[in-house]
């Protein structure tokens, strides 16, 4: 991860919470798709991208750009995905991302939406800013889009869905 060969010119680093071993495994198993995702981030003006979906590789990788007010921690969804890795990058705003443990299933996995929802009283939150991105693999039960400390402000985020390879 330190060599940043994977970055394809994008200068943002993975957050310290990212599972480096899983990242390396997935990158090598699906290199063309990961390279396309990182090239997309490096080659586009992320501030100018329109809100909505942007196809990177049909059925394998796409970006969703959104602007929103982050939720209070009690109202934020705790979720996981099996078919796609989440790359989440907050361009601006005041929010944090959580990694949950000791979870109970609230809503069973929906294969059409590639999501399961959980409850948990044990979530470790990390500040999200433009200096780093988060990767959430199928084993990472996460709580995105949670309001950070301080002023309640709008966030702009890009979520890239990247096909997970067993």
Question: Model regions: which residues?
Answer:
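A short secondary-structure junction signal
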Residues: 99-102, 144-148
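N-terminal leader/capping segments at the start of a protein or of a new domain
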Residues: 1-50, 61
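A short hydrophobic beta-strand segment most commonly corresponding to one strand
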Residues: 87, 133-135, 152-166
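Short, surface-exposed secondary-structure edge patches
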Residues: 87, 124-125, 149
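Acidic, glycine-rich flexible loop segments
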Residues: 114-124
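Conserved metal-binding segment of the jelly-roll/cupin
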Residues: 119, 127-147
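Short, conserved beta-strand element in jelly-roll/cupin
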Residues: 82-96, 101-104, 109-115, 161-162
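A short glycine-rich, His/Asp/Glu-containing loop-to-beta-strand
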Residues: 51-72, 78-91, 99
């Amino acid at each position: 991860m330190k060599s940043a060969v994977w970055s394809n010119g994008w200068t943002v680093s993975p957050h310290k919470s990212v599972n480096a071993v899983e990242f390396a495994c997935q990158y090598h198993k699906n290199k063309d798709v990961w390279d396309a995702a990182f090239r997309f981030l490096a080659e586009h003006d992320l501030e100018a991208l329109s809100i909505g979906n942007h196809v990177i590789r049909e059925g394998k990788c796409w970006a969703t750009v959104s602007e929103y007010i982050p939720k209070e921690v009690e109202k934020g969804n705790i979720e996981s995905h099996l078919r796609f890795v989440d790359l989440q990058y907050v361009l601006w705003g005041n929010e944090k991302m959580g990694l949950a443990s000791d979870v109970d299933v609230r809503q069973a996995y929906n294969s059409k939406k590639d999501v399961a929802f959980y409850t948990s009283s044990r979530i470790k939150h990390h500040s999200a800013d433009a200096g780093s991105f988060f990767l959430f693999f199928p084993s990472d039960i996460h709580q995105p889009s949670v309001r950070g400390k301080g002023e309640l402000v709008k966030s702009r985020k890009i979520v890239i869905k990247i096909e997970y390879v067993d």
